[in-house]
């Protein structure tokens, strides 16, 4: 059984000053308000209501921490961090501004953050806000893993095309930065339970959990492609 199945609620944070003073690794989950983020977290942890999925998109405006630890352990081995969903226009302006700053500051400055999982709807990935999230996080040099959620809504051919397209987008980001950063992507469906083990392996590896296994072939890293200038020999 995955140690992720033993995740439990730890705390809710509304200001950076309230972040837990711990040294263990954290894996954060981000995504648009309707990308199925909370549902995916629940499925990965094999729990129904670990992460609260509001019927009102954009309602969750805090950072929620879930500890990962064996049943009899005294201290967490790591944390899953559920970030506020972004991109919902009907959130009041002041509240929206607050949690956008909270989210941005957290992913850019939190030293304990080991990696970022970004949920994107497989039917329309890499929206402007999704790209902004990637661009916010890239300078940290830490890995990004994209879950193309709701893959069950696509035919097999369309799902394969969506995956190939996403890999090309990530390869473009890889070409823009110095050094190698792990940028991976996979198909995921909470309803059909597709891609769960692959995602669990990635998260467990980032948290350095004992169960960590080699990545699945589906989570193929983006390959660095030459920039247009390089291709022209300039």
Swiss-Prot record:
InterPro entries associated with the record: G_ENGB_dom (IPR030393), GTP-bd (IPR006073), GTP-bd_ribosome_bio_YsxC (IPR019987), P-loop_NTPase (IPR027417)
Region Disordered, residue ranges: 210-234
Keyword annotations: Cell cycle, Cell division, GTP-binding, Magnesium, Metal-binding, Nucleotide-binding, Septation
Record-linked Gene3D superfamilies: P-loop containing nucleotide triphosphate hydrolases (3.40.50.300)
Example GO molecular function: GTP binding
Needed cofactors: Mg(2+)
Binding residue positions for Mg(2+): 38, 60
Pfam families linked to this entry: MMR_HSR1 (PF01926)
BP GO terms, sorted: division septum assembly
The EngB-type G domain, residue ranges: 23-209
CDD domains linked to this entry: YihA_EngB
Recorded GO CC terms: cytosol
Function statement: Necessary for normal cell division and for the maintenance of normal septation.
Similarity annotation: Belongs to the TRAFAC class TrmE-Era-EngA-EngB-Septin-like GTPase superfamily. EngB GTPase family.
Designated name of the protein: Probable GTP-binding protein EngB
Provenance organism: Ralstonia nicotianae (strain ATCC BAA-1114 / GMI1000) (Ralstonia solanacearum)
Name of encoding gene: engB
């Amino acid at each position: 059984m995955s140690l992720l199945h033993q995740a439990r609620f730890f705390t809710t944070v509304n200001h950076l000053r309230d972040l837990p003073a711990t040294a263990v690794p954290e894996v954060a989950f981000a995504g648009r308000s309707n990308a199925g983020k909370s549902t995916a977290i629940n499925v990965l942890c094999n729990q129904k209501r670990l992460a609260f999925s509001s019927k009102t998109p954009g309602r969750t405006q805090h950072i929620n921490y879930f500890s990962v630890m064996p049943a009899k352990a005294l201290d967490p081995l790591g944390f899953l961090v559920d970030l506020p969903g972004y991109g919902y226009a009907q959130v009041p302006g002041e509240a929206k501004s607050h949690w956008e700053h909270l989210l941005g500051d957290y992913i850019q400055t939190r030293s304990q953050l080991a990696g970022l999982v970004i949920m994107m709807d497989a039917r329309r990935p890499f929206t402007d806000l999704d790209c902004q999230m990637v661009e916010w996080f890239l300078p940290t040099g830490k890995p990004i893993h994209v879950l193309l959620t709701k893959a069950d809504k696509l035919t097999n051919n369309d799902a394969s095309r969506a995956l190939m397209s996403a890999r090309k987008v990530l390869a473009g980001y890889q070409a823009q930065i110095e050094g190698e950063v792990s940028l991976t992507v996979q198909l995921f469906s909470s309803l059909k339970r597709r891609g769960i083990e692959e995602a669990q392996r990635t998260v467990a590896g980032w948290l350095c959990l004992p169960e960590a296994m080699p990545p699945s072939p589906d989570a193929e890293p983006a390959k660095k492609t030459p920039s247009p200038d390089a291709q022209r020999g300039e």
